[in-house]
């Protein structure tokens, strides 16, 4: 373990073997950091925060600060971060409120680029890429392998499905289903632009799976006006497979509505 002499690390914090803490970083009382995680200079980690192993946390990151929520009264809510994440400069990850599960969660192997904001009660899966200045409102859920380009702004309580791709400067007021591409023009609300076929191929999806999802997309977004009708047709016309079930369940469970 290496702690720079200018860093301020609480004697109550739990740092395991191989952790490095750079100049002028501050680690609070209730922080746990797993082995071989590197904390660069000028990082602040506070609150009830647990960080896993082999994370790379760059200068001026803030993790575990209070939620930007007027109802928060200092309760002991948490931030949980997995393993092997890269968290670049000026990223902010706020602790949760008491309105849900008391936890803001970031999974493993994610890449959060500069100035990304992860608000209170967000839940991020694994292997997500969030480009510079992408912003998540509170209670947002982001699925595995999703890509959010620069300056994407996501409304609170929105869900982003696994393997979705969102183009830059896009406002996201409604749920983005798994496996699709979405974009808006210069800050406009998102619209869907088909299946994320390149991403699916890169991640090893079979031709049969991609073709089945393409057929489902065509029925749901081009041939039917109501999702209830589209789901019925898809179930009647396409042999079920796990990715198709994931897509249909995501649509059926939506509370904010589905992007078209």
What residues fall within each predicted segment?
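Short, amphipathic C-terminal "tail helix"
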Residues: 238-260
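Basic, Lys/Arg-rich alpha-helical nucleic-acid-recognition elements, primarily the DNA-binding modules
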Residues: 22, 35, 53
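Glycine-rich hexapeptide-repeat left-handed beta-helix
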Residues: 1-2, 14, 38-50, 56-126, ...
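N-terminal segments that cap or nucleate solenoid repeat domains
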Residues: 1-29
